[in-house]
Amino acid sequence: MISLDQIALNIAAELRETFSTVRICAVQTPEQFLAEIQAINPEKLPAALIVFDNFVFSAESTIREDKLTLVILDEFRCSSDERALELFKLPCTVMDIFPPHGRDIKGVWIYPEDCTSCSTLLDYAALAIGLVCKQGII
């Protein structure tokens, strides 16, 4: 079985080819989330933050499902449709890496589950993309 930390490292390696900043985060509160966002250099955007959500065992405990959230962060852009649309392109960029039908990365099947807006700071726009990471445990 591939450990959760190794899954996060493998995802980070894939994202580093596309995003200027990639961080693996242990945030659990809104305050920690804000601190993590503010620690990113605005010149190193767009950024991707990998955050642990939970894991479950399914199919009579033969499959482990880890759930991570991939937070895609960019600067907030107003008064320009073209600049704002740059944020709209980021989920497509992620789906090029993790297609909706899934992808195997070193023995773990990874696919996006959902996408919601999640920004809490005026200067940033953020999208939270749920990633499901499945692997057999027998």
Whereabouts are the PLM-identified features?
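A short catalytic or substrate-binding loop motif that flags glycine-/basic-rich loops and adjacent residues
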Residues: 42
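Charged, amphipathic alpha-helical segments and their flanking helix caps
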Residues: 1-30, 35-39, 49-138
